[in-house]
Amino acid sequence: MDRGSFAHRFFCRAFSASPSFLRSPRAARRAETGQSLALGYLDIAPSALTPERRIPIGRLRLWHVVLLLLILVLPVAAQEGRLPRLDDSAQVSLITYTPGEELYQAFGHSAIRIKDDLLNMDRLYNFGVFDFETPDFYLKFVHGDLFYQIAVTPGEEEIRMVGAYGQGVSELLLRLSQDQKQRLFEALETNLLPENRYYHYDFILDNCSTRPRDVLERITGSQILERGAGNQTFRQMLDPYFTRIPWIGFGISLLLGAKVDRPASPREACFLPADLERAVQTSENGEQSLTLERRELFPPEALADSSPLLGPVWVFSGVGIVWFLFWLFRRKGHSVFPTALCLTIFGLTGTFLLIVSFWTRLWVLHENYNLLWLIPSHLIAGLWMFFAAKRQPFLLRWYLKFAFITACLFLGSSFLLPQRFSPAVYPLLAILVWRCALELFPGRTGVRS
């Protein structure tokens, strides 16, 4: 029987059997007129409310005391009865996955494992679970409204499955007292309750690595710090993970604002699974090391690397050079179409960044200085050029001067800004400067109309 339902029924019986002056006026009137009194799970007929069957006030107060004790004690007793007591030989460990092929595996993963052979229990607690079937998944992710959750899976099965996909799996056995193991187990199980399991995901400050860090800190009473990160910024810590996926890295770099260019504190540096593992290895539990030993359960398989020549820097540079050579040896007259296309693409990208940076709740996307060269109004100018053809209205010519000057200023002063930019930005800016110069100085650039 559900103990919560039992307590509710008990309360209904005590209330329905009470004297009329303890009932609400409406309930008393219903009883006097012969109507039934429906409370929760009960439907009590008027015959049950006769004076002979009412309970004396002294006994009623005693019932209220008993009721209060039941309401307070039963849920606690149920919770304690539901969770077993871990054996002294139970093992608690931090599981770390290396990066995998899929985008959501790009940074690896962290989980907590509790294994008790005596209880035949092997539970792996993951804080990075999400559902692709969530309505408007990508919109919610970008806006910062996507809920992640903690989930538990059989440890051995999960680890073998991950290893079979080629990801490396390592295990740090933790030195915890019996009381700390039990408290950790109870804390994780409490997190699994429906009202506790969901949380707002934060790419850096609240993810699958920071959650295990937080719960281990609460249990041990000590901070977990990654001192090996030095004075690196969040962006610098992410950069090595983008060498294999340069185009995705370029897109993420455009989205991330200046706030990720501040140095990460030793505690914040644990937002990456590999850094959390290093931090736990160097952390202490009281006067002893927090780690007993490290085991490599599955070695990582080599991931396919992308050729640097196919990355954004070389591709954009190559496009610019080929474009310039075609222009240099052209036979036909000048066309504004390439410049209009360039401005339209820049403006469209800037419009997207502007909307995202103001609309999102994610702090990592705020204060984006890429908007100084991906100017949203370029979109209007580019579309205008398509329709203006060779004729350049006065306002359009002034806007081309504005685009030329801002691009040149950005090229010369970007290193002074509080945000670090992808190297692929500079070939794109060089193309924009060149195309604007062709429109503004046709005689000096050898343009034939």
Tell what function each PLM region has:
Residues 76-80:
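Boundary at the C-terminal end of the N-terminal hydrophobic targeting segment
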Residues 64-73:
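Bacterial N-terminal signal peptides
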Residues 83-84:
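Bacterial Sec-exported substrate-binding components of ABC uptake systems
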Residues 1-47, 51, 56-63:
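N-terminal basic, low-structured, amphipathic or hydrophobic segments
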Residues 100-101, 166-175, 194-203:
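Second-shell loop/turn segments in exported
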Residues 87-167, 365:
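Glycine-rich catalytic cores of cysteine/serine-nucleophile enzymes that process amide/ester linkages
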